[in-house]
Design a protein with these regions (language model features):
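ABC ATPase "signature
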Residues: 118-119, 127
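Conserved ABC ATPase signature
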Residues: 32-37, 41
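A short, surface-exposed alpha-helical micro-motif characterized by mixed small hydrophobic
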Residues: 100-102
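A short, proline-enriched helix->beta-strand linker immediately N-terminal to the Walker B motif
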Residues: 52-56
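Helical segment within the ABC ATPase nucleotide-binding domain
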Residues: 73-86, 98
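Conserved ABC ATPase "signature" region
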Residues: 8-28, 137-138
Length: 151
């Protein structure tokens, strides 16, 4: 931590951040090794570590990968809360377009390391211009409504 805090003050601040990311028993989590934590807990610890210096930008690279849907939802809610309360910009990197649609105001679509399309999320999702973007969006699983299935 790049501050003038004492060792005890740094520990106290770290435990406060673990509490802010909604980890139960933050004092215990502070003492644990990563292999002793679940995937969701490890993700929260990483978010707490990233937020401890009050950054203006948080880079969230695949923050929900390998997490079950319930924990994904909690991590997404946490990121939204951080964005809203701390006014921290979040660069959300993901292959999960349903999460991108839910979280992002602007979207960059990349292929082979190059940006192929960018713009406001609504524009990208509802009026994609590039064929690659259209194919990605077409691959998003859709819930089949009963009325559609019956007709």
């Amino acid at each position: 931590l790049h501050t003038e805090l004492s060792k005890e003050e740094r520990k106290k601040r770290a435990i406060e951040m673990l509490e802010k990311v909604e980890l139960h028993n933050p004092e215990q989590v502070y003492e644990q090794y990563p292999h002793e934590l679940s995937g969701g807990m490890r993700q929260r610890v990483m978010i707490a570590a990233a937020m401890i210096c009050d950054p203006k930008l948080l880079i969230a690279d695949e923050p929900t990968t390998a997490l079950d849907v319930t924990i994904q939802e909690q991590i997404v809610a946490l990121l939204k809360r951080i964005n809203r309360e701390k006014k921290t910009a979040i660069l959300f990197i993901s292959h999960d377009l349903s999460l991108v649609r839910q979280l992002c105001e602007r979207v960059l679509v990349m292929r082979g390391g190059y940006v192929v399309e960018s713009g406001p999320a609504d524009e990208i999702f509802y009026h994609p211009k590039e064929e690659y973007t259209k194919k990605l969006i077409a691959a998003i699983p859709r819930v089949i409504r009963k009325t559609e299935k019956d007709s």
